[in-house]
Amino acid sequence: MNQKEINELRRRFRPEKSAISRVYGCYVNSSKEIVSDLDESLGMMPQEESEKYLSLLKKGLSGSLGKNLIDIVFSTQQVADSEEHRLLTTLWDSQLKDNEARQTFYHKVIDSLDMGDSSYLLLLTCDSYDVPHRGKDDSLQADASDEVFTYIVCVVCPIKEGKVELGYFPGDNEFHCAAEQTVAPPELGFLFPAFDDRAANIYNALFYSRKANEIHQEFIDAIFHVEAPMSAVEQKEAFQSALSDAFDCSLEVMQTVHEQLCEKIKEHRESRSSEPLEMSASEIGQILQSCGIADEQVAAFQENCGEQFGSGVVLNPANLIDSSRFEIKTPEITISADPEYSYLVETQIINGRKYLLIPAEDGVEVNGFAVGITVAQKDD
């Protein structure tokens, strides 16, 4: 799926556009026991409550592609005959009305998911989208629909315990201490089937993780039974390892790599392309060559990438660097700079000692106080 297709589905979760009639799910306590089973009509709820449910479900389609939203790909064999795909298909075909399939799914999630000591609300819903035709000018023509896309969305929301406060209990006509429980935004979730080329693709699902460094591999293995993809944090660490194992990285090389990857990210953002940004290891190798890195070291980097990520892999630069800052650390000091001005940081050896140099003209502040830079006078 691309960003445009995700955005198109996200708009379905607005109250004025939603055709979702029911939500299903269960409340699971910290002992992995189902406390309550949910089967509710949105139309019978107060509007404020139904909007809360839609908002939680919509969160399962938020974040960045390749970082929070990850493609799950089923093998042909899985689609043809596998327990995991058969269960998802049963839920989908029945539009979640098959109670036995729902209960089987709930217990699969409960048995596998590690949420620590947190209780959680598991939510499921189904929507049928009358897909409008998209014109040559990219506009949607609602009266020219020729396909209905039916899909299910699942989200897992932690239950947060509020602070203990004194409150009034009308039944007792007394004040007592109590802590309110609230449903937090989803920690993870998925959409099935994928909405590829604006049509159902049963060979794919879209997985959501709120934290890019915690993608709940145990859930992916149990529900989809596929090899969990590398998280964005793991990709960044693997990229750093591929670089450092190939050659000794200098500040100047890392400045150039960071600068050029930032430029690629900026160009992609400005292009408003719906497809995720991708670069091959050989394209990054060309950046290294422009820094003066020897051909054999560039080849070693590309080989390392193959070992770390797999043969012929394409990389998303947004997962390899933090494009919002350029940070340099020593054991005692951290320097954080706007990537646009990272070139101002230089290295120099003075009297045998290594230094990081930053030009300091006007506008220097220390803890919010404006200060001047003076030259210390040496005693004769």
Question: Can you describe what each PLM-predicted range is?
Answer:
Residues 275, 287-380:
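C-terminal, beta-strand-rich globular interaction domains
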Residues 3-7:
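Soluble regions of membrane-associated proteins that transit the secretory/organelle pathway
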Residues 8-12:
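Post-signal/leader-peptide non-cytosolic segments of secretory proteins
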Residues 17, 21-322:
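Long, hydrophobic alpha/beta structural blocks
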